[in-house]
Amino acid sequence: MRVGIKVLGCPKNEADCEVLAGVLREGGHEIVFDVKDADVVVLDTCAFIEDAKRESIDEIFSFVDAKDQYGYKLVVKGCLVQRYYEELKKEIPEVDQWIGVADPEEIANAIENGTDLVPDQPETVYRYRKRIDLEERPYAYVKISDGCDRGCTFCSIPSFKGSLRSRSIEDITREVEDLLKEGKKEIILVAQDTTSYGIDLYRKQALPDLLRRLNSLNGEFWIRVMYLHPDHLTEEIISAMLELDKVVKYFDVPVQHGSDKILKLMGRTKSSEELKKMLSSIRERFPDAVLRTSIIVGFPGETEEDFEELKQFVEEIQFDKLGAFVYSDEEGTVAFNLKEKVDPEMAKRRQEELLLLQAEISNSRLDRFVGKKLKFLVEGKEGKFLVGRTWTEAPEVDGVVFVRGKGKIGDFLEVVIKEHDEYDMWGSVI
């Protein structure tokens, strides 16, 4: 059969679906990239926060509406199904099949058999199989573990992704070796919490060991690590990231807040002062290191005083990149039962105010790259410009770099940065 796959949500879903595509192809099926050519459409969903759930529901109805026109069977899978299977099956009977969070081979078998598959509790993480690119790009997301044991009070992920399950270093290395042979120039390690990698398998935080192993592989490529939980970002992990030459000095550390009161309510263990000390130590050792974070505004109990402390924290740290999100009240979490809910309009105002502050900081932080030579990865072309990124930007969440010159997708070029705005930079090939 001909199978089309549409991915919603985080990079971890993208990695899952590319592996699933590989398993389906190994089983004799054809992967197609236009739904009108598909016998079966697989829609992968997200259920992390309200906006993600709403997007997933909207996409389900969009694909339901197009079923009669194109004649495909619709399979909806992923986190939304794992979390709300019974409700979805009852409310949207037009969907042909529902699949939750499961191993790619189990999912492929279920698709072939036409049976629903929703485990009581996810217990597997995929082992390496040959994967298929669902988009043409010079980078790949590699999932090193699944699930999470951290228990942040606002987070619903453990309820539908299960507890921590790490892949072996050997299995991850095999996958990365094959991706490099296929021409990938950037390997992006993802998980719910990359700092926890290996605790279940090796009884220790094994991210430094994994990074050293991957860094030893031949070839010119970047290694980027995302989702570094601040409470467990150790000196050993920081040192490995700073010392290994293929690991970019980009620290994605979602601190979530800067008020000690709110951090405690969130179930975080590091205080704002401890966070400042840790993040400042990275900059002291590597002044050009990029610090990225995520912030939740409007958490239950957040007062104007707490918000002012957050702004002061952000101004003091001077994050290079920052994503600010309005708190999403998720059933089943500890925070769901907290009193003193913040008015949504107030939370939205705080989000806008924080993003305006961050725009000024980001603009100022980019000043240091003007006139500098940076390695640039070509990802495409837009008008007269090559479009891509330097090591200072992660795909999809950060800005891009526009460069005058010649090159093709996957080329590393040396460029000099000429100018920038709050998020993007412009330069030319040397």
Curated annotation (Swiss-Prot):
GO terms for cellular component: cytosol. The keyword Magnesium does not apply. [4Fe-4S] cluster 1 binds at residues 10, 46, 79. SMART domains: Elp3. InterPro entries: Elp3/MiaA/NifB-like_rSAM, Methylthiotransferase, Methylthiotransferase_CS, Methylthiotransferase_N, Methylthiotransferase_N_sf, NA-bd_OB-fold, Ribosomal_uS12_MeSTrfase_RimO, rSAM. Its EC number is 2.8.4.4. CDD domains: Radical_SAM (cd01335). [4Fe-4S] cluster 2 binds at residues 148, 152, 155. It comes from the Bacteria. GO terms for biological process: tRNA modification. Catalyzes the methylthiolation of an aspartic acid residue of ribosomal protein uS12. Belongs to the methylthiotransferase family. RimO subfamily. PANTHER family: RIBOSOMAL PROTEIN S12 METHYLTHIOTRANSFERASE RIMO, RIBOSOMAL PROTEIN US12 METHYLTHIOTRANSFERASE RIMO. This is Ribosomal protein uS12 methylthiotransferase RimO. It comes from Thermotoga maritima (strain ATCC 43589 / DSM 3109 / JCM 10099 / NBRC 100826 / MSB8). The lineage of its organism: Bacteria, Thermotogati, Thermotogota, Thermotogae, Thermotogales. The gene is rimO.
